[in-house]
Amino acid sequence: MRTYEEHLAAVRAALPQPRVVSTPLSSAFGRRAAATYRAEYNLPPFDNSQMDGYALPTTHGGTFTVGRTIAAGDSPGSLPQGTALPIMTGAKVPEGTATIVPVEHCEPPHFPEEGATVTVPAAPEQFIRRAGSDVQAGTTLINEHALLDAPSIATLASQGLTEVLTFAPARILICTGGAEIGGTGEATIPDSNAPMLAALAAQYGIEVAGFVRTNDNPSALRADLAEAVITHHPDVIVTSGGISHGKFEVIRQIFEEDGWFGHVAQQPGGPQGLSRLGEVPVVCFPGNPISTLVSFRLYLAPVIGRAPAPFRATLTEPAEGLTGREQFRRGTISISDGTAEASFLGGTSSHLMSQAIGANVLIRIPADTQLSAGDLVEVFPLS
């Protein structure tokens, strides 16, 4: 029987490395950088005005002749003595500027015609954004594997980049079903796992290449999967159900010869499988809905998706660990006095999907332990 860490390592070793692609910056949000990016030049690239106001040659104030207006994008040259130059926000500051005073602090409190006079109060050096005050040339902007959010994209764009190298989202082929799934008889049930897996894939930045319905005929299912691989070119096949020891465990029948099927010392999601179909790895989860959800979060999302890292939280209620198996229970996180607190949500049975609504973490309960309220536990964010 494997531990959680052992099976995670096995899945990680079996799955392919992500492909590196050149991505337009406008489409890079939510992807991870496939290279480290450094600043080519300072940001801001030149001293510029933080306000609409006057560029002044002195901090002492006084009455000045109004010179030509400096708009954003102008090349201002130098600032003559005795002159106040109207300057707009973002405009390059002329040489010789000692300070900038907002127009509303002056008399008149608006911009008069060039050649008029303006009285300006004394002011220390202010409202000048210095070149390199945000980023200096040579500074690392984005590290490889960093998640590209809106500020990251803006910072890269400020360096004149229009494309970046990113890791392409992994593509999965989802295989779910069974004779009892989606039929019309009184003993059949709808397929909830396929849409759930698709939703989980979207949540963790994974693309769904296609779907295959399982049946109880191993040779027919193998042929369906082989055809789907040719059609959809997935990086990974993900299956749900059919991996235990029953009479109709069709996934196990197809893939056991070329893979590993066994148990991980956990609940839910104890039965697990890992195999290949030709060159495509196959990750096999148990079919109970909660087991599928937990398995996806623990073993697939952190390897080919963008799952948040686990962290420690304080348990709000006692919990007793199972003998020989650890648990990953659904729960919620709240913040109290700056401390993350974890509370259980719903029961522990693997079919209780509706009771998982609202859960935002999995709470890890070690085997053979007795936990009290206030103890620290490891939690795995679900979003």
Where are the regions a protein language model picked out?
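Helix-rich terminal scaffold detector
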Residues: 1-5, 162-285, 289-295, 299
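Intrinsically disordered, low-complexity, positively charged segments
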Residues: 1-64
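Flexible glycine/proline-rich
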Residues: 2, 21, 25-26, 30, ...
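Conserved active-site and cofactor/substrate-binding residues in soluble primary-metabolism enzymes
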Residues: 2-6, 20-23, 27, 41, ...
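Short, glycine/charged-enriched hinge/interface segments at domain edges or termini
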Residues: 4, 10, 14, 55-213, ...
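Generic secondary-structure signature for well-ordered alpha-helical cores
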Residues: 9-20, 34, 38, 133, ...
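Short, conserved secondary-structure segments in the cores of folded domains
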Residues: 45-46, 75, 83, 89, ...
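Alpha-helix C-terminal capping segments
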Residues: 54-56, 80, 181, 228, ...
